[in-house]
Amino acid sequence: MGRVFALLLCLIGVAAPAAAQGRTDAADPVTALLTRLEQLLVRGERDQFATLFDPSAAEAGIRRYETDLFLTGATKALVRERERAPLEGVPPGDGFRLVVEFFVATPGHARILTAGIDVRRPPNGNLASWRIVMLEGISSVDGLYRLRLETDRPLVAKNFRLTSEDLTVVLDEGTVFPVQTDDGVTGVVLVGRGEMQFQPAPPAERGQLRIFSGRETLNAQFETAFIRLNPSDYRAQVGALNLPAAPIDARAVRRAESVFERLAPKSFLVDLRDLSSDEWFLLPPNKDFVAEVDTRRYDTLTFTRSSAQAEDVSLFQRENKKTIALYASAAKLAARGRFYSDDAFRDYDVQDFNVDVSVQPERQVLQGRTRLALRVRSTSMSSVTLRLADALQVQSVVSVEYGPLLHLRVRGQDTVLVSLPRAVPQDSDLTLIVTYGGRLSSQDLDIDTIAVAGEPGQDSQTLFPVEPHYLLSNRTYWYPQNPVWDFATATIRVTVPDGYRAVASGEQVPPSQVIAPREGLTLQNGATFVFRSAQPLRYLALVVSRMSRVSEKTMTIESSRPGADIDKVTVAVEAQPRLQGRGRQLAPQVEEIMRFYSTLVGEAPFPTMTIALVESELPGGHSPGYFAVLNDPVPTANASWRGDPASFDGYPEFFLAHELAHQWWGQALGWKNYHEQWLSEGFAQYFAALYAQKARGDRVFGDMLKQFRRWSLSQSDQGPVHLGYRLGHIKTDLRVYRAVVYNKGAAVLHMLRRLLGDEAFFAGLRRFYDDRRFQKAGTDDLERALEAESGRTLDRFFERWIYGTDIPRIGFKSTIRDGQVTVRFTQPNDNVFDLPVTVTLTMADGKTRDVIVPLTEAEVEQVIPTETAVRRVQVNQDGAAIAEFEGS
């Protein structure tokens, strides 16, 4: 399972499955046989292993499995029967196919294995004559170690240093306590006077560090620290220093033990639960590094270098759960380049989901069974990593190809590790059926939605309670899925109590048309809703509430995309009881917006679109594929959201327009990694503005542009658009994220449109959408599409506006003469921005005329002919340029 455990860098722990309900009756001959095997393992009696096998068993196979199962010096062994089924070809009761789990440990290291074992009683044999006929498909979790803090052999430290990418941990004076394993020293506890020095290389990360600490370099004093690294890296960094032994100081020992007990379990811990009460750890891979530093000023800071990650360097504050820095090391950047996709770190593709869930919304409880059709991407795959909420207990994982499979839970990481009996080669298909259930909280609206918070210090007091709804979506991990999301078709079967309805990703179809994975899940008094998606989806979602369908209409869509297969879209509205009238009023707006966006992009992405209208204390929404949850605010006291980047006066349809735009931007077209979130949110924001112009006129559109500019100017120093969800994260101010990713992203698109012209701009967007439809996209893909349609090079444009934080300061001067106005713009030669600027001429009669001047060089001068006298010249009165202007 080598590659899988590279993912465990800072995991809280891995939990083994609960003990299987196998037979434990001592009189049971199979149990007796397994007990005998367990005794041989713990005693190390390798020479007796073959006596457990039927004479027909191949000797070579016996010796191979003997090597796998026996550990020299073993002090503990457990053999657990997990599954039992009748063995084909023998009389009933005379043979069984078993799935067995092994745990074998020495005082210092351990191994977990799972195997299929065929056992049978020979003809005319007695109960004691049962033997193993075949043992196959052993898969293992190896390399588990006990950590030993060497308090009896401390070392003297003076200017002791350990380094990793952009990090130096210096113990000026104190004591080093090695952390030992059977494979060598894998860490140290530092006690004394020290300093943590961190200086990230990327400018954007230095900016985030400045927000966190006030400086672009972190120098944090500490008295204790815990560091993990690979034994070979320890030997390379420390082995030649020949540190002298330190006298044993009882106080230093107590501090070291306290640090070790508190911080060691934070990373690489494997919690085996019923298999072992001891703590078992993995070794960090070569060059990986974890430093847990108890700083005086910032509490515990965690630095990690994790080679398995696309961005392998991070600095994290555990206490407040803040990511301070996250970026690619120089070596990683050189290997993968600036642009990357999370897909590069995906071992498999999910081709199709078949999800069957029973939901009890009042208790927030679900029972689920999901079938995943997988295709292997990596050269070979010996384990499958699934994402599933920690709150949901996995009852079984079964492969159609291999039967029941060993699975381990990664606690605190919403992860399940599934061990395969053999390595599966690239391009192979694999089908898993996962059964699970538990209590799972409804998803709150978060930074990927448009809900806005109230003003600081003002509490929302609802005059009457809202009708509840139960939302399961991309952040609840309510069904087993790939940790790196990918597009897949899906079928969702939802059973809810009487009186409730469900809306989910997909086109609703009669339940009789769908076959659930194994037997369907039901409620005693309930209704079943089925949704099927022939179009691949980024993720699956559902919402359950007391709703009624108040509107449904099928409309024709004129498509300009060659080969488009959707010419009709069914638009429906589901509304809670108090919102049914509002829902009927909403339906025509949904149709109009869908038609408008389809005209701009060239097609509709999905054949159905359902709005689930729900009560909430604040406006907002969430838009998975095929449907959107739209909040309708109830009367409140002391609630205000007007100071938010996403609050637009005079445009009540904004939230609806924004969420509907996500069906194209964010769902049909996804993003390659979190840096590219603006391709979803910035595009949805701009398309909502375009609809505002159509529905509400130029004044509302102009007000939105000015608000885009105002928030861009005030928050751009918090980080570039390309920083994605991390904007505002350190200070817990989500307005920063919305100001930069939403509003500045939309403003950038508007500047591009004015720079390239409408024809090239919208043709470029359609090309971009067509090329990346039902795929992930990056800014580089957008740039190529726009360059292809416009014939212009846009490297500098995107470098300045998406990857940079600077706001251009532009000198402006105008000269009025008879019959003409000369305008002159200047920028620094070393930091030229490409942007179109509106020059407004006010004539003597009070009329105005707007002229767009494209700025693409350090100095731009343009002569504007005039037919009447000009009284005044103004610049950027429409707020369309994100810039500061000086002069007149």
Each language-model region and where it sits:
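Bacterial N-terminal signal peptides
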Residues: 5-14
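Hydrophobic helix-coil surface modules that form long, contiguous segments used
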Residues: 335-337, 343-369, 375-380, 388-391, ...
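Short solvent-exposed beta->alpha transition segments
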Residues: 22-39, 43-108, 780, 784, ...
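Extended, low-hydrophobicity, Ser/Thr/Pro/Gly-biased non-transmembrane segments
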Residues: 223, 228, 233-347, 435-550
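Non-catalytic accessory/interaction domains
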Residues: 285-287, 294-334, 339-345, 469-472, ...
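Exposed beta-sheet edge and beta->alpha loop/turn motif
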Residues: 87-144
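A surface-exposed beta-strand-loop module
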Residues: 143-148, 152-155, 159-252, 308, ...
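Hydrophobic alpha-helical and helix-loop surface patches within well-folded domains
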Residues: 416, 531, 561, 570-828
